Swiss-Prot record:
The lineage of its organism: Eukaryota, Metazoa, Chordata, Craniata, Vertebrata. GO terms for biological process: signal transduction. It holds the Pfam family Ras. The modification Phosphoserine is found at residues 35, 126. Its EC number is 3.6.5.-. PROSITE patterns: RAS. It comes from Pongo abelii (Sumatran orangutan). The keyword GTP-binding applies. This is GTP-binding protein Di-Ras2.
Length: 199
């Protein structure tokens, strides 16, 4: 039973250069690198507490190229939640997410119960925008997933992205504690049932 597994696996997909690694590194390590280094596949871990026991948030930063279809399928089949990243400065990068989403549907079946975030990164580069947020929001509604714009460079909406992703989890109660503060809504929920909190 995957719910009893002691890790929670999040896979990050998107075209090369959209900022997948930058988002993950900003979240896990609080760092940002200006130079682009293509990723084959990296996995990052953070210890979280889940329903009063320890588990691991495991984030797989996948390759942006299409050279490794078997690795992509494996990341989807093992994943509990998915982040689909495009750059707001590249319409092509949004188009490249469509076959990935279709593959998630094919492998996972009913995706309505699976946390998926559509993420428009590089919102700090608004003058070069090719994808309007309204267009991405419409696609997210079609895909029945959540949508957010982020900037790994400015650290805008990065923690919030992971918080929102965990909030979408329906089979388990998982939550990200941001800066040690909990909202009143979180506190109310915690009184009702167990919670996952990043340490």
């Amino acid at each position: 039973m995957p719910e009893q597994s002691n890790d929670y696996r999040v896979a990050v997909f998107g075209a090369g250069g959209v900022g997948k690694s930058s988002l993950v590194l900003r979240f896990v390590k609080g760092t940002f690198r200006e130079s682009y280094i293509p990723t084959v596949e990296d996995t990052y871990r953070r210890v979280i507490s889940c329903d009063k026991s320890i588990c691991t948030l495991q984030i797989t930063d996948t390759t942006g190229s299409h050279q490794f279809p078997a690795m992509q399928r494996l990341s989807i089949s093992k994943g509990h939640a998915f982040i689909l990243v495009y750059s707001i400065t590249s319409r092509q990068s949004l188009e490249e997410l469509k076959p990935i989403y279709e593959q998630i549907c094919e492998i996972k079946g009913d995706v309505e119960s699976i946390p998926i975030m559509l993420v428009g990164n590089k919102c700090d580069e608004s003058p070069s925008r090719e994808v309007q947020s309204s267009e991405a929001e419409a696609l997210a509604r079609t895909w029945k997933c959540a949508f957010m714009e982020t900037s790994a460079k400015l650290n805008h909406n990065v923690k919030e992205l992971f918080q929102e992703l965990l909030n979408l989890e329906k089979r388990r109660t998982v939550s990200l504690q941001i800066d040690g503060k909990k909202s009143k809504q979180q506190k109310r929920k915690e009184k009702l049932k167990g919670k996952c909190v990043i340490m």
